[in-house]
């Protein structure tokens, strides 16, 4: 089937001739299938051209063609069901060049004349003759489809429709699909209404421009779904339960009869998939369709117009992820028949006609109506009139005291914040270099978040089941998780890992990249106790240092917030404590011991850590939110600076050789409201000689470590010519030794910063799987262990 998804997403204007009719279902969804005799023509285009040709035949030739499908009326005893030419064409597709048969020509089968087969058509209008000829072309089309089709279920449907149209030609009737399939629409609310409700539910609070972007994405998704080729029931059975497979087969048959086949066989009444099906079909097909759709866009990204590329590759994956939550969520309001959004929740979406009962009634589509039905002929959708609503009341859960507490003394007015936000989000108002690439100060999970939006990585909560038939893909992922955990946690017995990963009481949040597992977090939920135990957490070595671990944990936090569990407990070994601290874990355990004693597994030599979740924080977007907050504060500071008239002369002490001065000695610093941090001050060692000796001893231990050899001296240009072009701030252990002798390290922070830069530079220049990076990873663990041992950093 020719799938116009890519074209329609880039330019949401649908040309009906781009979609094909029934062909072999064993082809991949979205793969084009043209008529082999006419290269470059889709099945639908070929069908349209063929109908135009036969309708231009002379009357005699038309009767001959209809006679093939007309029973003999010479007498009641004749059982001939169609006139057969006594002089059949000798080569394929020669019928157009042959002369029309005479009405006196006898049938090769029964011996009666053509006139006795078409006597019922003598007084029939030309319009009706042309309608019947259209059905003849569709019958021939379906006949070829039946022979080419390899899937049994699809072949049966094609054969049924073939017989139905043949019967209609014989009886001069109109085709009506009968039986237990029912008639459209099959479910309410339908997919179109559900998706548009989703946009209204999730994005009505956004600014008009952003809200319009989300609306465009919803139209794009609906348009793709209307022309997307569904997987066959036999393919669906391989990944689903028996009961689900039976329901899907019914929906698939309905889709073939009412949506797919009529695209190229317009004798049958045609309906849009999104207007006659609802949540049940969407649940069955969404995960597979989403993956195939994103893959298709990724492969064909160079064909997309530049103005649509960012929309499709960056925003569309996130849009689909949010929609997925509402499709499979138990209590999503978007599927309620009486779904409404109060006026106070934000401006209503424009183009309200798509939500009206008329547009979802499931009426058959006339030619060329598919584009206008979804309102995709243009993107400039007019906003509806705002409704004047009553004054909003406080939510029931929010008391008056809570409301007062929200208004912080000295808080910045929202008008000012909105004004600053416009400056930050408007590219024309922002000066300076482009920020499209990741900055040096990008958050740890920024790369992972972008990859998820683009569909490069996926997150799935999976587990083994003893009560239901095992899904082959999930079992493969569980085996992959077992391998990752075994490889990354060598001190843990493999049998023990296998037992817990495949234990039905345990679940795992799996990180999938290119169809294979590259990491995961195995956990067990204790809902009655109010906490979850994290058992294993690992990312495969060649995919580390990309922020996957942080993003993985953030997804796990959001998953638990949805399920009402707000505490994590885990036993971390000495190498994992650092990771868990970065993710918000602490050694201070607030969960009462009576709640977890006897529930979680105790590991010798490991430290119990806890993480308390805040249900108001969107963890997967937290770093992005904090970054935006910093940008706002920076802009507010700039505004404040413009109001301060007092200007101090620049500092001259650095020209005289002074390397560092206390912050409080900067002229005017205290007038801005700055105060020194007593806590930070007390942390530094006051005796410089004591600090010097401690750092000297530590540096000596690092230099004698077996994995320190690549970092002993500066990198030579002869060995790496482009090194100093890539690395802006080179550092090595020899340079650090000289700095230590010159008393450069007046604080421990300067020393630790140089040590960390040694490792960072190595990772930036060398491939992750190189010997240098492996040495850097080992050395980093060693010196952080020594720093903790010496009390220079918190344990």
UniProtKB/Swiss-Prot annotation:
Residues 19-34 have a biased composition (Low complexity). Residues 1-18 have a biased composition (Polar residues). It is found in: Nucleus; Chromosome; Cytoplasm, Cytoskeleton, Microtubule organizing center, Centrosome. It catalyses: L-lysyl-[histone] + acetyl-CoA = N(6)-acetyl-L-lysyl-[histone] + CoA + H(+); L-lysyl-[protein] + acetyl-CoA = N(6)-acetyl-L-lysyl-[protein] + CoA + H(+); succinyl-CoA + L-lysyl-[protein] = N(6)-succinyl-L-lysyl-[protein] + CoA + H(+); glutaryl-CoA + L-lysyl-[protein] = N(6)-glutaryl-L-lysyl-[protein] + CoA + H(+). InterPro entries: Acyl_CoA_acyltransferase, Bromodomain, Bromodomain-like_sf, Bromodomain_CS, GCN5, GCN5/PCAF, GNAT_dom, PCAF_N. GO terms for cellular component: ATAC complex; centrosome; cytoplasm; histone acetyltransferase complex; nucleus. Belongs to the acetyltransferase family. GCN5 subfamily. Loop3 is required for substrate specificity and adopts different structural conformations in succinyl-CoA-bound and acetyl-CoA-bound forms. Tyr-603 has an important role in the selective binding of succinyl-CoA over acetyl-CoA. This is Histone acetyltransferase KAT2A. It comes from Danio rerio.
